[in-house]
Amino acid sequence: MEEFKKNFGFGFMRLPMQEKEVDIAETCRMVDAFLEAGFTYFDTAHGYLEGKSELALKECLTSRYPRDRYTLTNKLTNFYFKKEEDIRPLFESQLAACGVEYFDYYLMHVQSAEIFKHFKSCRTYETAFALKEEGKVRHVAFPSTTERRCWSRS
């Protein structure tokens, strides 16, 4: 069961809603139950619930629990930046929205051959690893849905 607890996550992509707003009380109850059961991994992205996911995560998790109680993943998605200079301000806004000083995992989200070209032209990977060097990201990661062909050297 311990191995399962290490590998089971709480995704903030879909949360209980009241009208068009996150039901904060219910989400907090869910977060509390998740942590009480021994789970620690939380996942969000800037675009989830039109940005409300990160804010709900801050309200229900990061403002209520010490940083060592959870592992947090966020993602960098291609349609939120057009050039290299857009990445850091986006990243800093993600940290602020989530209420943390660093992310445990920062995923290069939805990698395909086309998106890989965009990430590469914007020096996204270099920026992500620089953020890691600065201690703002513990691990840079790539989703397992990544197309193999976009990583070939040809």
Segments from the language model and where they lie:
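N-terminal binding-site loop/beta-alpha segment at the start of enzyme catalytic domains
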Residues: 1-70, 127, 133
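Structural preference for beta-strand elements that scaffold enzyme active sites
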Residues: 5-9, 40-41, 69-75, 102-107, ...
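Glycine/proline-rich, positively charged
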Residues: 18, 32, 82-154
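Structured beta->alpha junctions
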Residues: 19, 46-48, 76, 143-146
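Structural motif corresponding to the early beta-alpha repeats
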Residues: 48, 64-88, 109-110
